[in-house]
Amino acid sequence: MYQKLLEEYKSKLVTADEAAKQVKSGDWVEYGFGINCARDFDEALAKRKDELEDVKIRCDIGAYQHFTAEVDPDNKHFTWNSWHVAGHDRKFINKNLFYIPMKFHENPMMTRKDCVPTNVAVIQCTAMDKHGYFNFGGSSVNCCAMMETARVTILEVNEKMPRCLGGNQECLHISQVDYIIQSKNEPIATIGSAEPSPVEIAMAQHIIERLYDGNCIQLGIGGTPNAVGSMVAASDLKDLGVHTEMYVDAYLLMAKAGKITGARKSIDKYKQVYSFAMGSQELYDYIDDNPGLASYSVDYTNNPWVVAQIDDFVSINACIEVDLYGQVCAESVGTRHISGTGGQLDFVEGAYKSKNGQSFICLPSTIEIKGEVTSRIKPILTPGAIVTDPRTATHMMVTEFGIATLKGRSTWERAEELIKIAHPDFQDELVKEAQKMNIWRKSNKIG
């Protein structure tokens, strides 16, 4: 059996340059998510720049050098399109890379249903196992959906990719693959853990006071989640669960401290459930072949109705600004694109529907730009800012000054709650603006 698989493997083995010849002018090419993004293939495709026109590339958090974007800054030959802008994507956004709006849990559905069909799909993965399966490693997000719908399927094997157990839709059989590239086995991209600032530590402290034994926690990336992870690790909390889109080093801290058991989870008991991982090499070593973790496609991890089934769910995310109505922007500064909707709205909605669920969106009360300090809590969002979470979805907002609960609150109550956690230097100004907007009563208080 294995000998037959090896023969099939050899018959499909090609160089990156040979694989890149599958791309034709006008094609749509899609790369795997994050650390699964094609690297050797993209480098080979860049060499064909002068042979090709109007090749569109879809990616999601491209973790590696974008060779095709670098050789074609005017996007005459290659145009990048990203489901979420981060990592190397940020170098090209608003130049020759464009954003694809989405709710993250709908990504596989959009791939199967509404996207212009992919002509060539390329995913970086593990080596083939004895059963003929390639594991998607650090990301199961929409890999199966990509491969199901593509005209040509290509795997780029990297022997340094962690093998991440399922779950569901975490691997692909050789029979479903057209070509295989043996990569140069470059190190998997890592991201450092941001050291939390005093403000982020203060926000984390407010959240920690709301946690209790048995909570199931979803964390985003950044200083506040890292601070929460450190505080949980040092606390007496126990039997915590994990159900998240992104598995980050903060979870590793909690796991090493023995805080995570998943014993009280309503579903996927004892399993740490995630869709993709990005972090340190130590994190990748931890998730490698670890039966305590389960990798799923994002239409499971981020489905609000799945999240809602998990009692005592806690979602912790961050944003750029919020207005007095409770509209949250987490993806742009005015019209300048920064990141994307990602899974924030998925978890905001899912966590609230969970029994005893809590959703926290964190932001420092102020920001300093070119020497000028301004409030991140604004009367209205900056013109052009994208609404990530509508006011109807926002549950709780967190700054270093406290927590504002918005669900079930009228417009004047929301204004009062938000101004209470604004920086004191801006509270009077916000009250005046709220009065102009007719969302302030004379009896409102901010003390």
Curated annotation (Swiss-Prot):
TM ranges: none
Pathway as given in its UniProt record: Lipid metabolism; butanoate metabolism
Entry's induction text: Expressed during syntrophic growth with butyrate (at protein level). Seems to be constitutively expressed.
Enzyme Commission number, as recorded: 2.8.3.-
Pfam families per UniProt: AcetylCoA_hyd_C (PF13336), AcetylCoA_hydro (PF02550)
Superkingdom of origin organism: Bacteria
Subcellular compartments: Cytoplasm
An individual GO BP term: acetyl-CoA metabolic process
Listed GO MF terms: acetate CoA-transferase activity
Reactions listed under catalytic activity: butanoate + acetyl-CoA = butanoyl-CoA + acetate
GO CC annotation terms, alphabetical: cytoplasm
Function (record text): Coenzyme A-transferase that converts butyrate to butyryl-CoA. Involved in the syntrophic growth of S.wolfei on butyrate in cooperation with methanogens or an appropriate hydrogen-scavenging bacterium, as part of the butyrate oxidation pathway.
HAMAP family: But_CoA_trans (MF_03228)
Annotated family: Belongs to the acetyl-CoA hydrolase/transferase family.
Protein name according to UniProt: Probable butyrate:acetyl-CoA coenzyme A-transferase
Organism: Syntrophomonas wolfei subsp. wolfei (strain DSM 2245B / Goettingen)
